[in-house]
């Protein structure tokens, strides 16, 4: 239940701008957040493998 309440709290506008913290837009995970995509590493990896993120492909060198 705490996770659901924290997700709801993160969606509200904060009283002060500096209090805003990043959460994944898909699952609500607070850690391993990628700013460029607005999601956590797990959701990013899943969507990248499915080809749903334009311009992202698996690196090989």
UniProtKB/Swiss-Prot annotation:
The UniProt keyword set, sorted, is: Metal-binding, Ribonucleoprotein, Ribosomal protein, RNA-binding, rRNA-binding, Zinc
Sites binding Zn(2+) sit at 24, 27, 40, 43
Q: Which Pfam families match?
A: Ribosomal_S14
Species: Carboxydothermus hydrogenoformans (strain ATCC BAA-161 / DSM 6008 / Z-2901)
Cofactor binding mode and count: Binds 1 zinc ion per subunit.
The gene it comes from is rpsZ
**InterPro entries with a match to the protein in the record:** Ribosomal_uS14, Ribosomal_uS14_bact, Ribosomal_uS14_CS, Ribosomal_uS14_sf
Cofactor(s) listed: Zn(2+)
Q: What is this protein called?
A: Small ribosomal subunit protein uS14
């Amino acid at each position: 239940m705490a996770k659901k309440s924290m997700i709801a709290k993160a969606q509200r506008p904060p009283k002060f701008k500096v209090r805003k913290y990043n959460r994944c837009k898909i699952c609500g995970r607070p850690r391993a957040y990628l700013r460029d995509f607005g999601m956590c590493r797990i959701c990013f990896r899943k969507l990248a493998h499915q080809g749903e993120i334009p311009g992202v492909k698996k690196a090989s060198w």
